[in-house]
Swiss-Prot record:
Entry binding sites for ATP: A390, G430, C431, G432, K433, A434, L435
Domain of life: Eukaryota
Family of the protein in this entry: Belongs to the AAA ATPase family.
Name of encoding gene: Fignl2
Lineage, uppermost ranks: Eukaryota, Metazoa, Chordata, Craniata, Vertebrata
Phenotypic effect of disruption: Knockout of Fignl2 in cultured adult dorsal root ganglion (DRG) neurons results in significantly longer axons and attenuated effects of inhibitory environmental cues on growth cone advancement. Neurons show high rations of tyrosinated tubulin and low rations of acetylated tubulin in the distal neurite region and an increase in the average ratio of dynamic to total MTs in the distal most segment of DRG neurites.
Official protein name in the record: Fidgetin-like protein 2
Residue pairs linked by disulfide bridges in the UniProt entry: none
Length: 644
């Protein structure tokens, strides 16, 4: 028969069992317990599919023969008792059988084995007849055919299968050996694909019904019931495993789960970008373009419509709605962003923070002025983060603690005090005051409206007041919003002759601090804070001084500006350049790099920018902030500044 790994465990026990049974030294009690124990282990192994049905049938048959040879029978056998070593049983022992209990009754087994009562030594034939045992033992148990009887193959019936007898087995005569068992005790033909192509046994396929198969596989052949003696209980077959059932909750498949997980990650990233009112870059367009085409009808995610297609650019520089980016700005590319009404997640106005977008049209405001503000004064530049502002570490920390945190988390404010709604940045020109205002809008996820005080003052008192009121109304209509008014001192002339915008400005500032202006932050910048009167100064709850950049900040600004020109300086050259630009503002450092690029292009040769070009430009560009002005700014900060 074919070898399978499931034979390993039972066959490892055969040499020990054979030696114990055939030896004359063990006690009769030990020989009494050995065959039933082996039979129980065989039952257990077969019931748990550790061995095949063919192996179980062979082992059980041998155990039955051994057990019949061990028991003591009342009827004497034919002939005298042999003294050979292979004869065993109670009658082969010189001492009586000392069993604690009477012999195990197996009347039905004896009836099925007629030769068991005729010869008490027939048990060894079942053990020695296994070719597996003969192959496992180091020496053959029986050599040759010394007994002189006929071979086992001629003595047994054809259906028994003489191939299971060892070639060296000492066969006996018909009178001494037990007759072959009936066909009902033998194993049926193995299932298809197992063992030889032709079946060794031919038995009727009777037995219990086949169990349902697993999935689409055909069920295995069921072993018939009559292959065991009637006295041995057949092991209970294990139930076949149930076919797979779908999940009760309908979970998606593996591929769908991966896509859902990726979708959740994308939504999480989108939620993080929603906080700052911009999103990551879109997927490539269907036509193969690197980025999707920009929509000319909408501006950067803030709900305000851009200028009409045929509008001119006259008002851009006039009102400060857009212009060339400063050197401290973020990279030139800005991803396309969704309309602002997609991101209404704000703290309710009842807590004093930013309110939900109202969507109601402004009342009492000129529609033409509101359209002008929505088209030309909304900043559409890229978002600015804290890292885009070089230096100013103490100022950033103060803004986070005193302004951003109360606005974004109003319940954390002590008492019933409302968070600040106005902030003033003052300092020398070109120090990044407007850049800080843009950064606040990004941190708050708010719409940014930019107004230039000089442009409003130049448009006249009536037109300037109309535009100023329209800007505040537009900010209130679409909160959260940040209204950035640069050059605030231009709106407050030294002489109040009725043509200034002081009164409309104070009125709008008072309205921005009331309950109607929830979600609006007003940011004013000036380089001459001393020009502000006391009434205007008190309208700004927070006042911060933006100083000139220090050495580390100047090095960072120079590296960014020169990298845009394709120039990379080594550490020594950069340190020398930082030392030579002491007292420069961020704007002046940007002008220095532009002048160096112009110096490199004068020669007409396409060569990269070098340190010599920067040195040549440094001789032409110098610091413009006098020390007297810097001292006055420091004094004003000590008197009226919020301190940081």
């Amino acid at each position: 028969m074919h070898w399978t790994p499931e034979h390993a465990q039972p066959l490892n026990q055969w040499p020990e069992q054979h030696l114990d049974v055939s030896s004359t030294t063990p006690s009769p009690a030990h020989k009494l317990e050995l065959p039933p124990g082996g039979r129980q282990r065989c039952h257990y192994a077969w019931a748990h599919d550790d061995i095949s049905a063919l192996t179980a049938s062979n082992l059980l048959k041998r155990y039955a023969e051994k057990y019949s040879g061990v028991l003591d029978y009342e009827r004497p056998g034919l002939g005298s008792y042999g003294d050979a070593a292979f004869l065993n049983g109670a009658k082969g022992d010189p001492e009586p059988w000392p069993g604690p209990e009477p012999p195990y009754p197996l009347a039905s087994l004896h009836e099925g084995l007629p030769g068991a009562k005729a010869a008490g030594a027939g048990g060894s034939a079942g053990l020695g007849g296994s070719p597996v045992v003969a192959g496992n033992l180091t020496e053959p148990l029986y050599t040759g055919n010394a007994c002189g009887g006929p071979s086992a193959a001629t003595e047994y019936a054809a259906g028994y299968g003489g191939g299971y007898l060892a070639s060296g087995y000492c066969a006996q005569t018909s009178a001494a050996l037990a007759p072959p068992p009936p066909p009902a005790l033998l194993q049926p033909a193995p299932p298809p694909g197992y063992g030889p192509s032709a079946p060794l046994y031919n038995y009727p396929a009777a037995g219990y019904a086949a169990q349902p198969g697993y999935g689409a596989l055909p069920p295995p052949a069921a072993p018939p019931a009559p292959y065991l003696p009637s006295g041995l209980a057949a092991p209970t077959p294990l139930p076949a495993p149930a076919p797979p059932r779908p999940a009760p909750y309908g979970f998606p498949a593996a591929a769908e789960g991966v896509s859902l997980k990726r979708k959740a990650v994308d939504e999480g990233a989108e939620a993080r970008y929603r906080k700052y009112a911009y999103e990551p870059a879109k997927a490539p367009a269907a036509d193969g373009a690197s980025y999707p085409a920009a929509d000319d009808t909408e501006c950067r995610g803030n709900g305000f419509r851009s200028k009409p297609p045929g509008a001119t650019e006259d008002g851009t520089g006039k009102y400060g709605g857009g212009g060339p980016l400063k050197v401290l700005g973020s990279p030139a590319y800005a991803p396309q962003l969704e309309p602002f009404d997609k991101f209404p997640e704000r703290v309710p106005a009842a807590h004093g923070g930013f309110a939900e977008p109202s969507g109601e049209p402004a009342k009492g405001v000129d529609p033409g002025a509101l359209e002008l503000v929505s088209s030309k004064m909304v900043d559409c530049g890229p978002p600015v983060q804290w890292a885009d502002v070089a230096g100013q570490g103490a100022l950033k920390a103060a803004l986070e603690e005193e302004l951003l945190w109360p606005l974004l988390r109003p319940p954390a404010c002590p008492g019933s005090a409302l968070p600040p709604r106005t902030v003033l940045f003052f300092g020398p020109r070109g120090c990044g005051k407007a850049l800080l205002g843009r950064c606040l809008a990004t941190r708050l996820g708010a719409t940014l409206l930019r107004l230039r005080g000089a442009g409003l003052a130049a448009s006249g008192a009536v037109e300037g007041a109309r535009l100023l009121q329209a800007a505040f109304a537009a900010a209130r209509c679409r909160p959260p919003a940040v209204l950035l008014i640069s050059e605030l001192d231009a709106l407050l002339p030294a002489r109040d002759d009725g043509a200034s915008l002081r009164a409309p400005l104070l009125t709008c500032l008072d309205g921005s601090c009331g309950a109607r202006a929830d979600g609006v932050l007003v940011v004013g910048t000036t380089s001459r804070p001393a020009a502000l009167d006391e009434a205007t100064r008190r309208r700004f709850a927070l006042r911060f001084y933006v100083a000139l950049p220090d050495g580390a900040a100047r090095g960072q600004i120079l590296q960014r500006a020169l990298a845009q020109q394709g120039c990379a300086l080594n550490e020594r050259e950069l340190a020398a350049l930082v030392q030579g630009t002491q007292g420069f503002s961020g704007g002046e450092l940007g002008q220095l790099c532009q002048q160096a690029a112009a110096e490199a292009g004068i020669s007409g040769l396409q060569r990269p920018l070098s340190y010599k070009d920067v040195e040549a430009a440094l001789a032409k560009v110098g610091s413009r902030a006098p020390s007297k002005e810097l001292d006055s700014l420091v004094e004003w900060d000590k008197m009226y500044g919020s301190g940081h």
